[in-house]
Design a protein with these regions (language model features):
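Short aromatic-glycine-(Arg/Gly/Cys) micro-motifs in beta-strand/loop hairpins
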Residues: 1-13, 28-38
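Helix-coil modules at protein/domain termini and other flexible surface or pore-lining loops
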Residues: 7-9, 18, 88, 178, ...
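A short, exposed loop/beta-hairpin motif centered on an aromatic-Gly-Thr core
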Residues: 10-21, 92
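Low-complexity, Ser/Pro/Thr/Glu/Lys-rich regulatory segments of predominantly eukaryotic nuclear proteins
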Residues: 26-52
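RNase H-like nuclease fold core
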Residues: 46-99, 110
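RNase H catalytic domain
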Residues: 65-68, 108-186
Length: 188
């Protein structure tokens, strides 16, 4: 740390983040800052002694939001490899339920491109029901700051109405399996 400190002292707004490996740190340097700030470096582990009766050859999605509304992110993790399948955000003046909905539809659309019928897990009953109804039933008002989010919602709803899919969309059982592996790890 002392050697590192010499290189970073004097920068009053510097932000610090550690990574398990030099390769992961280098990769993060080449990516968008917002994909890494405030986030765990690894997917959430299963609870001790938890078994995995869920399909490990599947995708897990999750969203995080700093308020209601707030700054929202969403992502998917490939459970067979533990790698990030996609990551989106930040989106301003959004909600967690919107992020969960967009994450599920994004996963469906991405998987459909290659005919992949893997299961998608989400820990949001609300978002799963919105996807089944092909409608994001948010009560959030449209405003200039969240215009991009509403464009994505419109696009997602259109995709649901114009495409079919056979991917099971299942509720992640947090009480049995621990936090969903796509979790951002920022719960208080």
């Amino acid at each position: 740390w002392e050697e590192c400190k010499k290189n970073v002292s004097g920068y009053p707004t510097a932000k610090y983040k550690s990574f398990p490996t030099k390769e992961q740190a280098q990769k993060a340097l080449n990516e968008n800052y917002w994909e890494h700030v405030g986030k765990k470096n690894t997917p959430a582990p299963l609870l001790p002694n938890a078994t995995a009766p869920y399909d490990t050859h599947s995708i897990a999605v999750d969203a995080a939001c700093s308020g209601n509304p707030g700054t929202m992110y969403y992502r998917a993790i490939d459970l067979s490899t533990g790698t990030i399948y996609f990551s989106q955000g930040p989106f301003l003046r959004a909600t967690n339920n919107i992020g969960e909905f967009l994450a599920i539809v994004h996963a469906l659309a991405q998987l459909s491109l290659s005919g992949d019928t893997r299961t998608i897990y989400s820990d949001s009953k609300i978002a799963i029901s919105w996807v089944k109804q092909k409608k994001c039933k948010t009560k959030l008002p449209l405003e200039a700051a969240n215009k991009k989010v509403f464009e994505l919602i419109e696009r997602a709803e259109k995709w649901l109405h114009t495409h079919t899919y056979t991917n099971p969309i299942l509720k992640w059982e947090t009480q049995l399996w621990g936090e969903i592996p796509a979790d951002y790890g920022n719960k208080k």
